[in-house]
């Protein structure tokens, strides 16, 4: 037991380096996923059926296929089309595209939950649809979308372990490499699991604090 604990301590710098890549992938995937997801949500809500259906097809594909398969298509498949990507950019693109599909549905549902009368009231005072969306609808919709978006972000942190399959040196990959050298399977994978758990716990705490702050602001106003 003492030797296993010492090994975990000695391996900490490598695991923390992997955790750094895990955080980078998570933050990048969430940021780009939100940006694309918002655009897709607007497409889903479009009055033009062709535009709406394009977004529907995108969401259906990325929600209906395994994330691991999507990563393999990007990293191993695209080179056959002349598009070669390094592991980290390939993983970031894969996570962003996947997150965009889920963010799209979360944001679409949140925007749709706002009463139609608010759009009509804004139009009656001369506001354009873009102004109404930015000033009136989005602030309310984001309060509704915050909990599921936070949960999706926590899930993304755990899903980044899949990047190990395309050689990204994130947390799980580092644990694999150390295990291959030391054969201490239980110790290293447990150490990696604890770091994932710490990251998820911190994010969950931050999410709860943010939700409490938003709710308190709503009550005060």
Model-derived segments and spans:
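Transmembrane alpha-helices and adjacent helix-loop boundaries
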Residues: 1-221
């Amino acid at each position: 037991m003492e030797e296993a604990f010492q090994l975990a301590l000695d391996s900490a710098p490598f695991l923390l380096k992997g955790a750094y890549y895990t955080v980078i992938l998570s933050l990048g995937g969430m940021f780009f996923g939100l940006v694309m997801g918002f655009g897709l949500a607007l497409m889903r809500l479009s009055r033009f059926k062709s535009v709406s259906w394009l977004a529907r097809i995108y969401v259906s594909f990325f929600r209906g296929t395994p994330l691991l398969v999507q990563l393999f298509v990007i990293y191993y498949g695209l080179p056959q089309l002349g598009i070669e990507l390094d592991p980290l950019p390939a993983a970031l693109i894969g996570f962003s595209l996947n997150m965009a599909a889920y963010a799209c549905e979360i944001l679409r549902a949140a925007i749709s939950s706002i009463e139609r009368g608010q759009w009509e009231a804004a139009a009656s005072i001369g506001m354009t649809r873009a102004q109404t969306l930015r000033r009136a609808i989005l602030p309310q919709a984001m309060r509704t979308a915050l909990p599921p978006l936070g949960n999706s972000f926590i899930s993304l942190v755990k899903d980044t372990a899949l990047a190990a399959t395309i050689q990204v040196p994130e947390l799980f990959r580092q644990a694999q490499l150390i295990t291959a050298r030391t054969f201490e399977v239980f110790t290293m994978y447990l150490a990696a699991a604890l770091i994932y758990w710490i990251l998820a716990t911190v994010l969950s705490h931050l999410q709860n604090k943010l939700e409490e702050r938003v709710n308190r602001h709503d009550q005060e106003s």
